[in-house]
Swiss-Prot record:
Subunit comment: Part of the 50S ribosomal subunit; part of the 5S rRNA/L5/L18/L25 subcomplex. Contacts the 5S rRNA and the P site tRNA. Forms a bridge to the 30S subunit in the 70S ribosome.
Family from the record: Belongs to the universal ribosomal protein uL5 family.
GO biological process, one term: translation
GO molecular function, one term: rRNA binding
Protein's name according to its UniProt entry: Large ribosomal subunit protein uL5
NCBIfam families xref list: PRK00010.1
Keyword tRNA-binding included in the entry's annotation: yes
InterPro entries: Ribosomal_uL5 (IPR002132), Ribosomal_uL5_bac-type (IPR020930), Ribosomal_uL5_C (IPR031309), Ribosomal_uL5_CS (IPR020929), Ribosomal_uL5_dom_sf (IPR022803), Ribosomal_uL5_N (IPR031310)
Organism name: Alkaliphilus oremlandii (strain OhILAs) (Clostridium oremlandii (strain OhILAs))
GO cellular component: ribonucleoprotein complex; ribosome
């Protein structure tokens, strides 16, 4: 079992139950899924760049990414409907906990002059979005083999009803929020 899942069951769940006074164990919020999205604005003309980004995202998450395509044509961006514009991965279960563990304990501390993540990036329904500027913070990515730096969005989807519950859940799981 993933380390973070063990921690959730042994420490986080009881602490949440005590703080928010849930009557049932099923009321305790948990992370439902983590969506990792990589937008590749300029790679629409470069199929090799798309391939490299998809491969890197696969290495980072341990799961094959889905190539996202443009829904509509936008003339200003020289974009046609159906063109590949990014890649995303939805992680659930064991892989989700393993990825979260690697992100919180290995990758985020490697960010240059890191002071914590934005504590206000909740969406009002208990989900948290986190933006990363470059994929090099993950140890699985080799610096020499990277053609181009890509940022990514990481969205933690939780079963929490409010942002307060979600913030507490992520804080107890080790999310380094900025003061």
């Amino acid at each position: 079992m993933a380390r973070l899942k063990d921690m959730y069951k042994s420490e986080v769940a009881p602490a949440m139950m005590e703080k928010f006074g849930y009557k049932s164990v099923m009321e305790i919020p948990k992370i439902e899924k983590i969506v990792v999205n990589m937008g590749l604005g300029d790679s629409k003309d470069n199929p090799k760049g798309l391939e490299a980004a998809v491969k890197e995202l696969g290495i980072i998450t341990g799961q094959k990414p889905v190539v996202t395509r443009a829904k509509k044509s936008v003339a200003n961006f020289k974009l046609r409907q159906g063109m590949p514009i990014g890649a995303k991965v939805t992680l659930r279960g064991e892989k989700m906990y393993e990825f979260a563990d690697r992100l919180l304990n290995i990758a985020l501390p490697r960010v240059r002059d890191f002071r914590g993540v934005n504590p206000n990036a909740f969406d009002g329904r208990g989900n948290y979005a986190l933006g990363i500027k470059e994929q090099l913070i993950f140890p699985e990515i080799e610096y020499d083999k990277v053609e181009k730096l890509h940022g990514m969005d990481i969205i933690f989807v939780t079963t929490a009803k409010t942002d307060e519950e979600s913030r507490e859940l992520l804080k107890l799981m080790g999310m380094p929020f900025a003061k």
